[in-house]
Protein backbone atom coordinates (compact mmCIF):
# COMPACT_ATOMS: atom_id res chain seq x y z
CA UNK A 1 0.00 0.00 0.00
CA UNK A 2 0.82 3.66 0.05
CA UNK A 3 1.40 5.57 3.26
CA UNK A 4 -0.63 8.79 3.09
CA UNK A 5 2.13 10.60 4.96
CA UNK A 6 4.47 10.01 2.01
CA UNK A 7 2.12 11.18 -0.75
CA UNK A 8 3.40 14.29 -2.53
CA UNK A 9 0.51 15.16 -4.87
CA UNK A 10 -3.27 14.69 -4.61
CA UNK A 11 -5.70 15.54 -7.41
CA UNK A 12 -9.16 16.49 -6.13
CA UNK A 13 -11.70 15.83 -8.87
CA UNK A 14 -14.26 17.94 -7.00
CA UNK A 15 -14.97 19.10 -3.46
CA UNK A 16 -18.04 17.10 -2.40
CA UNK A 17 -17.82 15.72 1.13
CA UNK A 18 -17.25 12.13 0.01
CA UNK A 19 -14.15 13.15 -1.97
CA UNK A 20 -12.33 15.66 0.25
CA UNK A 21 -12.58 14.24 3.75
CA UNK A 22 -9.38 13.24 5.54
CA UNK A 23 -7.14 15.74 3.77
CA UNK A 24 -5.23 16.05 7.05
CA UNK A 25 -3.96 12.49 6.54
CA UNK A 26 -1.75 13.83 3.73
CA UNK A 27 0.48 16.26 5.68
CA UNK A 28 3.16 16.62 2.97
CA UNK A 29 0.89 16.67 -0.08
CA UNK A 30 0.22 19.46 -2.50
CA UNK A 31 -3.41 19.38 -3.65
CA UNK A 32 -4.69 20.19 -7.13
CA UNK A 33 -8.20 21.18 -8.15
CA UNK A 34 -10.04 23.12 -10.82
CA UNK A 35 -10.01 26.85 -10.11
CA UNK A 36 -13.74 27.08 -10.93
CA UNK A 37 -14.52 24.48 -8.24
CA UNK A 38 -12.86 26.59 -5.53
CA UNK A 39 -14.66 29.69 -6.82
CA UNK A 40 -17.95 27.81 -6.63
CA UNK A 41 -17.53 26.43 -3.11
CA UNK A 42 -16.39 29.74 -1.64
CA UNK A 43 -18.66 32.10 -3.56
CA UNK A 44 -22.20 32.94 -4.56
CA UNK A 45 -23.10 29.34 -5.50
CA UNK A 46 -23.08 28.39 -1.83
CA UNK A 47 -25.87 30.88 -1.04
CA UNK A 48 -28.21 28.26 -2.57
CA UNK A 49 -29.04 25.48 -0.07
CA UNK A 50 -29.58 22.96 -2.90
CA UNK A 51 -26.05 23.49 -4.23
CA UNK A 52 -24.55 23.63 -0.75
CA UNK A 53 -25.89 20.24 0.42
CA UNK A 54 -23.03 18.18 -1.07
CA UNK A 55 -20.35 20.18 0.72
CA UNK A 56 -19.41 20.19 4.39
CA UNK A 57 -18.34 23.54 5.76
CA UNK A 58 -15.37 22.02 7.59
CA UNK A 59 -14.12 20.48 4.33
CA UNK A 60 -14.38 23.82 2.52
CA UNK A 61 -12.53 25.48 5.40
CA UNK A 62 -9.81 22.82 5.16
CA UNK A 63 -9.43 23.53 1.44
CA UNK A 64 -9.10 27.25 2.09
CA UNK A 65 -6.49 26.54 4.78
CA UNK A 66 -4.50 24.60 2.18
CA UNK A 67 -4.49 27.73 0.01
CA UNK A 68 -3.07 29.77 2.88
CA UNK A 69 -0.51 27.03 3.62
CA UNK A 70 0.62 27.25 -0.02
CA UNK A 71 -0.34 23.60 -0.53
CA UNK A 72 -3.15 24.13 -3.08
CA UNK A 73 -2.55 24.46 -6.81
CA UNK A 74 -5.22 25.44 -9.28
CA UNK A 75 -5.72 24.25 -12.82
CA UNK A 76 -8.24 25.36 -15.41
CA UNK A 77 -9.90 23.38 -18.16
CA UNK A 78 -8.09 20.44 -19.74
CA UNK A 79 -4.40 19.67 -19.69
CA UNK A 80 -1.59 17.37 -18.63
CA UNK A 81 -0.86 16.98 -14.94
CA UNK A 82 2.23 14.82 -15.47
CA UNK A 83 3.42 12.50 -18.24
CA UNK A 84 0.69 9.89 -18.65
CA UNK A 85 -1.92 11.75 -16.57
CA UNK A 86 -4.32 14.15 -18.29
CA UNK A 87 -7.14 16.07 -16.61
CA UNK A 88 -10.45 17.08 -18.18
CA UNK A 89 -12.93 19.66 -16.93
CA UNK A 90 -16.35 18.00 -17.30
CA UNK A 91 -18.64 19.97 -14.96
CA UNK A 92 -22.27 18.99 -14.42
CA UNK A 93 -22.10 17.11 -11.13
CA UNK A 94 -20.27 20.08 -9.64
CA UNK A 95 -19.14 23.26 -11.31
CA UNK A 96 -15.50 22.14 -11.41
CA UNK A 97 -15.97 18.38 -11.71
CA UNK A 98 -13.03 16.88 -13.53
CA UNK A 99 -11.97 13.46 -14.70
CA UNK A 100 -8.57 11.94 -15.47
CA UNK A 101 -7.04 9.83 -18.19
CA UNK A 102 -4.19 7.67 -16.89
CA UNK A 103 -1.92 5.61 -19.12
CA UNK A 104 -1.65 1.99 -17.99
CA UNK A 105 -0.10 -1.19 -19.36
CA UNK A 106 -3.31 -1.96 -21.25
CA UNK A 107 -3.82 1.58 -22.54
CA UNK A 108 -5.34 4.84 -21.31
CA UNK A 109 -7.96 4.35 -18.58
CA UNK A 110 -10.55 7.10 -18.09
CA UNK A 111 -11.23 7.77 -14.40
CA UNK A 112 -14.60 9.52 -14.51
CA UNK A 113 -14.83 10.20 -10.78
CA UNK A 114 -18.36 11.56 -10.29
CA UNK A 115 -18.68 12.90 -13.83
CA UNK A 116 -20.21 9.41 -14.19
CA UNK A 117 -21.31 7.58 -11.05
CA UNK A 118 -22.73 4.48 -12.73
CA UNK A 119 -22.46 2.96 -16.21
CA UNK A 120 -26.24 3.30 -16.64
CA UNK A 121 -25.93 7.09 -16.53
CA UNK A 122 -23.90 7.07 -19.71
CA UNK A 123 -25.82 4.19 -21.32
CA UNK A 124 -29.22 5.83 -20.82
CA UNK A 125 -28.21 9.49 -20.42
CA UNK A 126 -29.77 9.22 -16.99
CA UNK A 127 -28.76 12.21 -14.84
CA UNK A 128 -27.56 11.59 -11.30
CA UNK A 129 -29.69 13.33 -8.66
CA UNK A 130 -26.83 15.38 -7.18
CA UNK A 131 -25.93 17.97 -9.77
CA UNK A 132 -24.90 21.52 -10.49
CA UNK A 133 -26.06 21.79 -14.12
CA UNK A 134 -28.12 19.06 -15.80
CA UNK A 135 -27.39 20.08 -19.40
CA UNK A 136 -23.65 20.18 -18.69
CA UNK A 137 -23.91 16.82 -16.91
CA UNK A 138 -25.65 15.18 -19.87
CA UNK A 139 -23.13 16.63 -22.32
CA UNK A 140 -20.40 15.47 -19.95
CA UNK A 141 -21.59 11.88 -20.30
CA UNK A 142 -20.95 12.12 -24.04
CA UNK A 143 -17.58 13.76 -23.48
CA UNK A 144 -16.55 11.04 -21.03
CA UNK A 145 -17.64 8.27 -23.40
CA UNK A 146 -15.69 9.90 -26.25
CA UNK A 147 -12.56 10.37 -24.13
CA UNK A 148 -12.74 6.81 -22.78
CA UNK A 149 -13.17 5.37 -26.27
CA UNK A 150 -13.85 1.75 -25.39
CA UNK A 151 -16.21 1.16 -22.46
CA UNK A 152 -13.72 -1.26 -20.93
CA UNK A 153 -11.44 1.76 -20.34
CA UNK A 154 -14.16 3.78 -18.55
CA UNK A 155 -14.16 3.76 -14.74
CA UNK A 156 -17.24 5.41 -13.17
CA UNK A 157 -16.83 6.80 -9.67
CA UNK A 158 -19.34 4.70 -7.72
CA UNK A 159 -20.40 1.71 -9.84
CA UNK A 160 -20.09 -1.69 -8.06
CA UNK A 161 -19.32 -3.23 -11.46
CA UNK A 162 -15.89 -1.59 -11.27
CA UNK A 163 -14.87 -3.64 -8.23
CA UNK A 164 -16.08 -6.78 -10.01
CA UNK A 165 -14.17 -5.89 -13.18
CA UNK A 166 -10.69 -5.14 -11.86
CA UNK A 167 -8.44 -7.16 -9.55
CA UNK A 168 -7.28 -5.90 -6.18
CA UNK A 169 -3.92 -4.13 -6.25
CA UNK A 170 -2.77 -6.74 -3.73
CA UNK A 171 -4.39 -9.44 -1.56
CA UNK A 172 -6.55 -8.05 1.21
CA UNK A 173 -7.52 -4.91 -0.72
CA UNK A 174 -10.40 -6.44 -2.70
CA UNK A 175 -13.06 -3.82 -3.40
CA UNK A 176 -10.88 -1.04 -1.96
CA UNK A 177 -7.76 -0.57 -4.09
CA UNK A 178 -7.88 -1.86 -7.65
CA UNK A 179 -5.31 -2.50 -10.36
CA UNK A 180 -6.84 -0.55 -13.24
CA UNK A 181 -4.07 -1.63 -15.57
CA UNK A 182 -5.69 -5.05 -15.80
CA UNK A 183 -9.29 -5.91 -16.56
CA UNK A 184 -10.87 -9.17 -15.42
CA UNK A 185 -13.88 -8.93 -17.72
CA UNK A 186 -15.08 -6.86 -20.64
CA UNK A 187 -17.67 -4.47 -19.22
Report each predicted region and the residues it spans:
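Active-site metal-binding motif and surrounding structural segment of the metallo-beta-lactamase
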Residues: 1-33
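Active-site metal-binding loops of divalent metal-dependent hydrolases
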Residues: 15, 36-37, 92-94, 113-115, ...
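Active-site gating loops and adjacent loop-to-helix segments of metal-dependent hydrolytic enzymes
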Residues: 115-125, 170-181
